[in-house]
Amino acid sequence: MRKILPMMMMVVTPVVGMAQNRSGLNEKDLDRSVRPQDDFYEFADGGWQKLNPLPPSRSRFGTFDQLQDNNNKRINTILTGLEKKHYSKGTIEQKLADFYKLALDVNRRNQEGLAPVEPVLKEIEAAGTIEDLRRLQLKYASRGLGMQFDDDFDADQKNAAMNILNIGQDGLTLGEKDYYINNDSATVAIRNAYRLFIDKMFRLYGFNAEEAAQRRDAVFRQETLVALISRSMTDLRDPESNYHKMTLKQFDADYPDIPLKEITGAEGIRPEYIQTVVVGQPEFMSGLDKLITLQTPEDIKALMEWSVIENSADYLTDTIREAQFDFFGKTMRGRKVDDPLWKRATNQVQDQMGEVLGRIYVKRYFPESSKKYMEELVHNLQVSLGQRIDAQTWMSDTTKAAAHQKLDKFLIKIGYPNKWKDYSKLNIDPSRSYYDNVVACRLFHHNQDIEEKAGKPVDRDEWLMTPQTVNAYYNPTTNEICFPAGILQYPYFDPKADAAFNYGGIGVVIGHEMTHGFDDQGRQYDANGNMKNWWTASDASNFKKRAQLYAKYFDHIEVLPGLYENGELTLGENLADHGGLQVSFNAYKQATAKHPLKTIDGFTPDQRFFLAFAGVWADNITNKEIRNRVKQDPHSLGRWRVDGALPHIDAFYKAWNVKPGDKMFLPENQRLQLW
């Protein structure tokens, strides 16, 4: 864990080694036909949108995706280099090269047809009774065939130093319950298309028309019943209401028809590790407990077979994979064509062996100097957030002291892990099918999780993203912020650009992740990562009142005719966006106070800060993807992460001379502020 100096000893320092004569901005990204005071997103990103039309293989394409594409090309260079050589069996190079070759070999997959999944499908068909099918589910428990709830080891949110078995709702192929129960025309169209898709997939897997129709109806009926007892994405955001700790004895009493001990035992989990568990959604488990008793053998068969289909469709013939893409890519998201083979293959290797690929990636592409710059930026943002906490008049000194304690104990991860996962037990066998090897990878990760987490303390060195990922995160149970090497590149971070650009780009990202520790979810966890109330009643009430204003504000943003942002679902991300802006701007001003920056390319330093921020969220997106994200993405759309945030930032008004009558203008008494 990084040692943090006490707050009173911390000072903001300039980021050394950064040039002061480059703006980092690209004039072509701007649309000067738009007044920044009326639509800052369009002014800052309109040119980028024109220069980067939506590729037919994408439903959304933004600067995040652009950078991830560049990283994927680098990863592909690594893999093609490995592919050309021979390696001893069992080496990580052999595993990467052989898996990549399998992912590329579409001719072999087309020749094999359904052979990789026929044995398990025949087993399911041969099972004649419910008892036979339940035994078969136990045999394949590690693959979750037909299981309608999720179980995995993760931190106990009220004893965050230890792992515990967490049990929660699952069983919806479409992810969000609204797809099954809402009756607006767009949702009904998706629902009808989903039924046709289920039918088509069963036929492609060898079932005749009558069998496919029967299984389609069973799957859709069962998933709809599960949707009716499921919580919405918004309801899943409340940590306290999704935490119910109980003994195994109590679980068995409450849900007598869910044989947890038998299921987990079949997964390889010893009984002593499940004597106490956490149930996320008790009403879901109660509903499922009743639903299970009503299932017929045909229902169970259909669910198990559907699990096989959905778990294998991307790894079998072109015809099957294309049918999968037609629904999830085209119908659900508005993509026109699938990614090229090299990209799909590269992504599959990353999905299964991403961290070991990341180890090669950082050696080749991540300069240690970038890590040094980031450490200083993070330090400065940490100081700034402490100052922002002190400046809040709605908080008591008692709560501020606890907030500082939490801020001081942030675990900071930059670039890549200090220790790497061990892949020695993973066997990649090129004589077996691509799908068989994917299953081997999944079982390896499943078993590794059990081995490393069941009954054991939380490993604070574990990374939840690979180093090459273009993203960042805050984890409340370890109180950590993580910035993988993948995001530490242009247009978020440029060691040759001045502080205005870097604080507006990666600085806001850092501030965003830090603010997550104090958003509506993060504030419920203490300095040690435990879900524990450290707020006075008055301060908690003040926080909730202010946060609710953000939810209401975003509820009124119309993203498509008749479709609005979900302010409750996106609340945490919106609070983090606004807090990140405030914290990073404050840090930037202090870091440059003794060495003021110059106007470059016609823009003042403060203007460049906000242009860099807006550039982070430049994108093009389909209407279908907008609808999909509004239903289940906790992030607001890119446009509104800019135009929804900046009207509340006082410094933005000064930098861009925003006045009454301008479309970006909000009266001071309507500007929201939390951090």
Name these PLM-found stretches.
Residues 1-20:
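Bacterial Sec-dependent N-terminal signal peptides
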Residues 20-28:
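Short, Gly/Pro- and small/polar-rich lid/capping loops
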Residues 35-38, 43-108:
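Active-site-surrounding "flap" and adjacent substrate/cofactor-binding loops of secreted or lumenal enzymes
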Residues 68, 219, 254-258, 278-282, ...:
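Intrinsically disordered, low-complexity linker/terminal regions across diverse proteins
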